[in-house]
A protein has these predicted regions:
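N-terminal regulatory/effector-sensing and dimerization cores
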Residues: 2-93, 122
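Short, flexible active-site loop motifs that bind/organize anionic cofactors or intermediates
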Residues: 41, 93, 115, 167, ...
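Basic/polar phosphate-binding segments, predominantly the helix-turn-helix DNA-binding elements
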Residues: 170-193
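A short, mixed-charge helix-start or loop-turn motif at secondary-structure junctions
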Residues: 17-19, 89-93, 114-118, 146, ...
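Aromatic/histidine-rich interaction motifs
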Residues: 86-108
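Short acidic/polar alpha-helix capping motifs at helix-coil junctions
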Residues: 1-4, 23-28, 106, 125, ...
Length: 193
């Protein structure tokens, strides 16, 4: 079960603020960094863009500083299972989800529930965090699929281009082009444009 220790949605600290926990925080820390940050990971300085995510494991050193403005949403929690292993996304590594607004919305809902006195609060928080992690995992998996599809299409279009250049005398109608790459007209226009 995931147990939430603390969370904050849309948290602003002072400009250039630094977080430095050399021994980690003793729990998992999930960050949605809404502004660029300087992060030190395994003795390497990385400057993030906005909407970077990071899942720190419990004993991993946490050292990050705002490039200027400091804004993030975050969760401190413990879990019986490693969320990264369970849901297949990176830990102690920066990644950029394509759905940062959705993640932020989850964190907002989690914080609202955290401060409520409603029945089954802890169970509901567990479900919300699990749902957020599933959403992140699906996003990263589908992005990998889309990248692979894009690479395959690129090769198909490169081969088609070579075929057209090698056979300039032939008539190359849109129907034939679609047939060569096995796409419908509408799909062809989307990818070719």
């Amino acid at each position: 079960m995931i147990t939430l220790h603390f969370c904050e949605y849309n948290r602003f600290n002072q400009d250039y603020d630094t977080i430095f926990r050399p021994g980690g925080s003793g729990d998992y820390l999930f960050l949605l960094l809404k502004t660029p940050m300087k992060i030190y990971l395994q003795d390497e300085l990385i400057i993030t863009k906005e909407n970077a995510c990071l899942l720190f494991t419990p004993q991993t050193p946490q050292h990050y500083q705002a490039v200027k403005r400091f804004c993030n949403s975050y969760l401190h929690f413990s879990s019986d299972l490693s969320p990264a292993r369970q849901y297949g996304f990176p830990e102690n590594e920066i990644f950029y989800p394509s759905n940062p607004a959705e993640i932020d919305s989850f964190i907002r809902s989690i914080q609202m529930e955290y401060f409520s006195l409603a029945e089954y609060r802890d169970e509901y928080i567990h479900c919300l965090i699990s749902q957020m992690f599933i959403s992140i995992s699906r996003d990263l998996l589908h992005r990998a699929d889309r990248k692979e599809d894009g690479e395959n299409l690129y090769l198909l279009f490169q081969n088609l281009r070579l075929k057209m250049l090698s056979n300039c005398q032939e008539e190359w109608t849109i129907e034939r082009l679609c047939q060569e790459v096995n796409l419908e007209k509408s799909q062809f226009y989307v990818y070719y444009h």
